[in-house]
């Protein structure tokens, strides 16, 4: 029996994780659950799974949850509580599914404690990739990617990197793949959040629509698999059946295929190196429609281009880019800027922020805060 600390329990990854746990009650126990503000949903989850701990990042939400729970579940609050619970001696696996930079600290603490980190938080590597990977190695932690593309590469590379030419991450293209760029200015938040293949939270849905999500995954792949930017390719694949591919120098290509359902990836991370039932039906190739592949349009999806540029530039560029994107997406979801403004704000923030090398986690956090302040100031010009 493995104890799971699930960070981001009320999000899409959290829900899928619990769905897999439900299939294997003899193998997994929910030790701790966390959420940001959704205390009402947490009441239901606490009643069902009876974790030892429930953490609400928001203090008022924690108080409401504590008042509503009648069992002896310990309710904690704050980001620091997340850091503490992932290092608990009874935590075996950490599902790091908190969206955004706020999820970095707890994932890193789990790695320092030598836990299995099932990483769904891209920002941990985008912000502190070198530090994170060094920590994983130093403390003998296990790092299993919980992302359809990176899980695919992880599986395809099991035979080793000898003779590796490049990897290719697939991208659905989001809801606006065939929308003319002339119509981008009028795109609404609800339209941007209507992903054709995947059920996701609003922030990551917007990232998918701008293709910043794929840009973050490019950076993540760079750190996860120790690849140069030139070894990472992106292809548009609207059906989301081929999750990613590995190309070797002898002309061989290994791809991982499956129905687009995050439970497959989650079950793999939970059962690795074995496999177990995820609740997802197997892919029927005979009934699968034709598979399409396109080169991404970097003029149309500027965020993807900005991500590649930030990776090539190195230093603090990736941290600055991520911070500006999080701020811009927040304003877009609040109907305060247009969809087309998102890449403009990111680009302006990158141009304003001084480029430098960061050598510590404190410097990363400080750079993140400064970049957010700059992005806020830039957005005032768009009012």
Curated annotation (Swiss-Prot):
Annotated EC: 1.1.1.267
EC category: oxidoreductase
Binding residues for 1-deoxy-D-xylulose 5-phosphate: 122, 148-149, 172, 195, 208, 213-214, 217
The protein's annotated pathway: Isoprenoid biosynthesis; isopentenyl diphosphate biosynthesis via DXP pathway; isopentenyl diphosphate from 1-deoxy-D-xylulose 5-phosphate: step 1/6
Statement: the UniProt record of this protein carries the keyword RNA-binding: no
Source domain of life: Bacteria
Required cofactor names: Mg(2+); Mn(2+)
Keyword set, alphabetical order: Isoprene biosynthesis, Manganese, Metal-binding, NADP, Oxidoreductase
Pfam families named in the record: DXP_redisom_C (PF08436), DXP_reductoisom (PF02670), DXPR_C (PF13288)
Binding site for NADPH: 10-13, 38, 121, 123, 201
Residues the record lists as binding Mn(2+): 147, 149, 217
Catalytic activity: 2-C-methyl-D-erythritol 4-phosphate + NADP(+) = 1-deoxy-D-xylulose 5-phosphate + NADPH + H(+)
Primary role: Catalyzes the NADPH-dependent rearrangement and reduction of 1-deoxy-D-xylulose-5-phosphate (DXP) to 2-C-methyl-D-erythritol 4-phosphate (MEP).
Protein's UniProt name: 1-deoxy-D-xylulose 5-phosphate reductoisomerase
Provenance organism: Vesicomyosocius okutanii subsp. Calyptogena okutanii (strain HA)
Gene designation per UniProt: dxr
